[in-house]
Regions:
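C-terminal regulatory
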Residues: 1-94, 120-127
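A bilobed periplasmic-binding-protein/Venus flytrap-type ligand-binding module shared by bacterial periplasmic
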Residues: 94-104
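Short amphipathic alpha-helical coupling segments at ligand-binding clamshell hinges
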Residues: 67, 103-117, 123
Length: 127
């Protein structure tokens, strides 16, 4: 309806769906050619969960900014389209932490090894 945005200025004519966990204060963060930009917007819909923001975007309520693993399935099914990929913010690292001091028990170590293996296997988490 509003066309596909190709530059940040194109976002002015679009509706937005925000999620509290991703866009505190209704902001979207972008990075282009090493420069960070923060755009404040008035969302058409503000949700409290990423899942509801994705569902709203799939239903046509507007654009949403989400981590790739949250939208991998709707993208693969053609329900969503990635836009402004040249303005994507830098990737965030994934950390697996444990509380047990320097050395983990065998059970914790086994869980950590499994979690790390599975996380590394997800293409959505690779930059």
């Amino acid at each position: 309806r509003h066309g596909t945005p190709r530059a940040l200025a194109d976002l002015a004519s679009h509706n937005f769906v925000t999620a509290g966990a991703v866009a505190p204060g209704h902001e979207m963060r972008f990075n282009h050619e090493g420069k960070s930009r923060v755009l404040k917007m008035q969302p058409r819909l503000a949700t409290t969960t990423n899942e509801s923001a994705v569902a709203a975007a799939v239903s046509g309520f507007g654009l949403t900014q989400q981590m790739l693993y949250k939208v991998a399935e709707p993208l693969a099914r053609g329900e969503l389209q990635e836009v402004l990929s040249d303005f994507e913010p830098p990737a965030l690292p994934v950390h697996v932490l444990h509380r047990e001091g320097r050395y983990a028990s065998r059970r914790v170590r086994a869980f950590l090894d499994l979690a790390i293996e599975r996380l590394r296997a997800l293409p959505e988490l690779r930059a």
